[in-house]
């Protein structure tokens, strides 16, 4: 447990310091990160290329590689945006993100005056930012996000802290049906 806490606090401190950098500079870091991640480390490159080839059988290799590079660019942005969550203000987050149609959904739910379950899919854009949904809706409505616990306990603790900071509740995937 001491080792988990040591890793947790060390990584938290480092990531928090990085999160204090302006987002514009973090995006610059993201652009730099792309090259070693794609060309040197080749993080999961075979899996990604195989998945893209299976998803787009009509595309030739040149087009697949282009999509692959776009994914890596997106992935690097995801990394720095996730870091930024350690220090981003509510105002700054709300300026950078919107939920379209949310007012109508909340209004309909309030009219019916019944219990409801609002499901949203998080694997689009930066799904860590989507955990901020409670900022946009009434405080009377509780929010939760389903998550898969990470294998590394220190990182699991770190990401739970990150995801819970907006007022939502993280629901482990295995307990979803019982919890909802």
Question: Model regions: which residues?
Answer:
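Catalytic core of membrane glycerolipid acyltransferases/transacylases, capturing the structured
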Residues: 115-175
